[in-house]
Amino acid sequence: MGIFIGLTFIGLAMGLAHIADRQADAVWRYLGSFVLAALWLIIALCGMMLAVVPLVDLPDNIAAGANLGGDPGSNQALFESLLSSFPKIGAWTFWVAIVAILLLLPWPRRLLARLIPIDPERLVHTIALHGALVLVLFSAFTAFLVQSMLSVLEAGDDGGLQTLIEDGTTVGGLWAQQLGFVALAFLGVGLFFARTPVEAMRRLGWTRAFSWRWYLGAVASGVGMALLVQVVWNRLLPDSQAGIEQLSEMMFGPIVKTGLVGALTIGLAAGLGEETLFRGAMQPRFGIVFTSMLFAVIHTQYGVSLALVQILAIALIFGLVRQRANTLTAMAAHATYNLIFALAAVIGSQTPLWHGGPVVPIPEDWKATPTAVVSPVDGIPPAMTPTAAP
């Protein structure tokens, strides 16, 4: 619920920016820019403190009260590894905040307007750029933590890592995040502030027309691309998958274990939320390439690997569907792409549960037909090797 409230708050800020842009007096836009500058200055100071203040005594205190199920020594090692990434996170936070403050000046926005279709004079477009920076910041935060988690797994003892991840991975949490994306998209395009519900749906590409040609082409292309990257990754870099496979199993195992509900959540929630926000709201302003790059960036929970290449390719495919058809067609293609492989995971195959990314080995007691499964390192199963997007 917290992430839903946070995303909705950003959407409301963009809605107020729509009102400020419609005022004849520019003082409202200046006031909005001043508030944004103050907020980003606070964020920059917090990042600087995180980068320079030592956190030596925290692992003992946090590990003692975490109740993660691991032995105290392993829990302490886990938190030492996680906290070791905080200076990097602080540095990223500081520099992202500096970039955001610079974007409050007219000339950087005018330069960007030559690359992407934004209006450098509109406050709402400035906030949209800041929203993109927030996505980059949280993605960097996730990437650094994932690298720390992988180092723990490589040491051979998860130290309560599985408990820590599983407690934050629920069907309800995934739906809350994706519904937050929907709320952010609608408020971001000015629902109730600058557009009626019908106008907002039209702006987001929620139109009745449905292109079966683009739908089927996107699903087939996405699945084919996923299998191709999986084969290449298995053959060229098999060792790089081991830790990500284990981490992915921890992330998605609790959702997959819920059966059909989990499969539908993985399939439908991301199709609804991610397509509405990225292809519906962002793409008309940021363009296909920049939006697809942002889409790949938010999936850094899989680490910096070939997974991101596959996610970028899938994003470009869905972006073309949005451009040539509409968002609902892209949404259906995304949901189908996810659902195919989420269902395969539920019924027992060894399944890459990401946009063409790492294989999630399903535990033996989940497998319906374990004899039909081929090791992801040994090769691709003859019938199917599913992938799905979280």
Q: What is each stretch, according to the model?
A:
Residues 1-30, 46-57, 62-66, 71-82, ...:
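Transmembrane helix-loop-helix hairpins at the membrane interface
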Residues 2-5, 54-100, 122-195:
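Alpha-helical transmembrane segments in multi-pass membrane proteins
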Residues 6, 10-15, 44, 116-119, ...:
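Intrinsically disordered, low-complexity acidic/Q/S/K-rich activation/interaction tracts characteristic
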Residues 11-20, 93-115, 186-197:
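Membrane-water interface of transmembrane alpha-helices
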Residues 25-42, 81-91, 111-140, 161-178, ...:
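Interfacial transmembrane-helix boundary/kink motif in multi-pass membrane proteins
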Residues 51-54, 107-113, 146-147:
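Transmembrane alpha-helix boundary signature
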Residues 94-97, 177, 208, 356, ...:
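Intrinsic disorder/low-complexity segments enriched in polar/charged and small flexible residues
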Residues 104-108, 196, 211, 259, ...:
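Helix N-terminus capping/helix-initiation residues
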